[in-house]
Amino acid sequence: PVQKLDPEKALAEVNAFRTKNGRSAVVLDARLSQAAAVQSKDQARRSSIGHYGSDGSKPMQRAERAGFHAKLASENVAAGQKSFSDAMRSWEESSGHRENLLRPEVTAIGVAMAKNEDGRAYWTLVLGAE
């Protein structure tokens, strides 16, 4: 079964990875979590992953719609992992996702997970700066 998302635990995992790699810690931002939830739900509904929403939106637009005045908004998505930790591991091992995790200018994150009808999990991590 898929583990329930614990945003505080997810934040701790992101910060552990960032600080281990010489980057500053970030905070959890409800607006970015809202933007992440929109994308996770959209992906689960469509059973596909990507960075464009079904309405054509990009991560920056979704962050701004949620009230986050983004100078920067990047997004990591994953599907099928049973926990945030598993999704995080896959991002750490993928160069583009790793780069997003370690962007020095990032100050805040938002996280979300939604499941499709088959119980497959769609994870979204939005990383941003205002």
Regions found by a protein language model. Give the residues of each.
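A short alpha-helix/helix-coil micro-patch that ends at or immediately precedes a cysteine
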Residues: V2-R45
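Conserved beta-strand positions that form and line the central face of beta-propeller blades
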Residues: A25, N76, V126
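Short glycine-/small-residue-rich flexible loop motifs, especially phosphate/cofactor-binding loops
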Residues: N15, M60, R98
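Short, surface-exposed glycine/acidic/tryptophan-bearing loops
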Residues: A30-S83, L101-R103
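Disulfide-stabilized extracellular recognition modules
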Residues: A79-E130
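Well-structured core secondary-structure elements of compact alpha/beta domains
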Residues: P1-K4, E8, S74, G128-E130
